[in-house]
Design a protein with these regions (language model features):
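HIT superfamily nucleotide-processing domains
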Residues: 1-174
Length: 174
């Protein structure tokens, strides 16, 4: 568990740039240190925020979990990362990476679906020599998914509009 701030109401969304960069550099460094230790089969890093995120701790935190037996990536395929590519910046430095994450999270909480999301998950992956962040708004899970594993997805046009709006925010970073 990585506690981000002494401020109980703080979050990646609200941090000033210096604090955001410090937290993200520290988290990425701790994650890499656990990976480099070779004590674990895989090391996962993620963040839960909000009442629908699946987390239990309200204080701002990320979780870095070392799995001794399990491969946390075993069920991931390239299909998990398909869709509309909103932003890709080659080998972005950690501070720019943090800024992009903050922009995406602000978009999720303040603009996506009219700003109705109050929860999100943020996942980090090392894949293909790259570090990838995947931010997702969290909602009450549909009974279609719970009972039948059928996902309800937005229409392509809605996804395209969301992607374009978020892309416009991210393009201000470079």
């Amino acid at each position: 568990m990585l506690i981000e701030s002494a401020d109980h109401d703080a979050d990646l969304v609200t941090y000033e740039p210096d604090e955001l960069h410090h937290v993200m550099r520290f988290a990425l460094g701790c994650w890499q240190q656990m990976i480099d230790s070779q004590q674990y089969r895989s090391v996962l890093m993620y963040k839960n925020k909000g009442p629908l995120s699946g987390g239990s701790l309200v204080h701002p935190h990320m979780q870095i979990v070392g799995l001794e037996q399990e491969d946390g990536y075993v069920s991931l395929t390239s299909a998990n990362f398909e869709g509309i590519n909103v932003w890709q910046q080659g080998r972005a430095e950690a501070d720019l990476f943090a800024d992009a994450i903050q922009v995406a999270l602000r978009y999720i909480l303040n603009e996506h679906h009219g700003g109705r999301a109050e929860s999100y998950n943020l996942f980090f992956y090392h894949l293909g020599g790259r570090t990838i962040a995947k931010a997702l708004p969290r909602w009450v899970v549909s009974p279609y998914f719970v009972g039948y594993r059928l996902a309800q997805v937005n229409a392509e046009t809605t996804l395209d509009v969301d992607a374009e709006r978020l892309r416009a925010h991210l393009e201000t970073l470079v």
